[in-house]
A protein has these predicted regions:
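AAA+ P-loop NTPase catalytic core and its hallmark functional loops
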Residues: 8, 12-255, 271-283, 287-313
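Short beta-strand-centered aromatic/proline hotspots
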Residues: 1
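Amphipathic alpha-helical segments that form the core helices of the histone-fold
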Residues: 266-268
Length: 313
């Protein structure tokens, strides 16, 4: 392999990275007050707790039921930690079952002409970007982190994400270059606890992350404000019924709290209308209940009748 293949970042590129020349010039301050306003939680100390565990572990996974806003929270936690809404210091990727070391770190990648080219992946690239800008914090958000095999995806870099090994160097197998995960890089993963088709995370990965469970927040100040702005009595009744539904789901021996219905289904960015409610219930909530209780159609029908009565009332 020639020298040009090994040299992913020349001096000019590194200088641009350190100056953030590709960053958004409209960067604005982002405070805990912004986080509390945008991220719904029934825990008034939510922001402080998340910041504390992120600082302590440096690698965290936000886990929870569908619709609790895991990715939304992850990005705003990054903004709050850096103090700015600066997307140039945040990278978001999504794992899937076919995601590989070559996709994430580096490797030979097929080209349109049938040849292969040696390319750096997003993790390698982002680590290098953070490394040349050590006075600022950088954040990698990994959606659906449990859909990929983390140890295979990271390869020999797997040990380097651990906080105690930040800054250490190892030799990468593809190019014999020394590589390390910088101390100013934070990793925030998200994980859907209601996905039956995924294997459990191995203990080696669990030891490198702190796990934080996000819960539905229908009683939070932020969600109550959405209901108040909508001025829709049916919306209020549906929300109360979803809270009752979540109690039933959490007590179900085959399901549990990890399968509850999150509040973000109803966070539409505008006043929630009767038509919105009908679409959410009919095409999002009910298909989910069909999946949850596929062996108990009577339960599904009972809830469908209850929601229909509210919507038609």
């Amino acid at each position: 392999m020639d020298d040009t293949t090994l040299n992913f970042f020349d001096g000019e590129t590194l200088t641009k990275m350190s100056r953030n020349e590709d960053s958004n010039t409209n960067i604005r301050r982002y405070t805990k007050a912004d986080f509390d306003r945008e991220v719904f939680s029934e825990d008034k100390d939510n922001a402080d707790k998340l910041l504390s565990i992120l600082q302590y572990k440096q690698n965290i996974i936000l886990q929870g039921a569908p619709g609790v806003g895991k990715t939304y929270t992850a990005k705003r936690l990054a903004y709050m930690k850096m103090g700015y809404k600066d997307d140039s210091r945040l990278m978001q990727v999504q794992f899937h079952q076919s995601y590989t070391y070559e996709d994430f770190v580096m490797g030979l990648r097929p080209q349109s002409d049938g040849t292969f080219k040696f390319e750096a992946g997003p993790f390698y690239t982002f680590c290098k970007k953070a490394e040349v800008d050590p006075t600022k914090e950088y954040f990698m958000v990994i959606d659906e982190i449990n859909r990929g095999n983390m140890s295979k995806i990271l390869g020999e870099a797997f040990s380097l994400i651990e906080k105690d090994h930040r800054g250490e160097k190892i030799t990468l197998k593809y190019n014999n270059i020394q590589f390390g995960v910088p101390k100013n890089l934070y990793i925030i993963g998200t994980m859907n606890t209601a996905d039956r088709g995924l294997v459990q995370l191995d203990y080696a990965l669990r030891r490198r992350f702190a796990f934080i469970t996000l819960l539905p927040a229908y009683s939070s100040t932020g969600f109550r404000a959405i209901m108040a702005r909508s001025q829709n009595v049916k919306f209020n009744r549906i929300a109360r019924s979803i809270k009752d539904l979540n109690i039933e789901i959490s007590k179900d021996d085959m399901l549990g709290p990890g399968f509850m219905i999150g509040h973000s289904y109803f966070c539409l960015g505008h006043k929630v209308t009767d038509e919105d409610l009908s679409n959410i219930i009919e095409y999002e909530i009910m298909p989910l209940l069909d999946e949850y209780w596929y062996d108990f159609p009577d339960k599904v029908e009972r809830w469908h009748e209850k929601f229909t009565k509210i919507l038609n009332g």
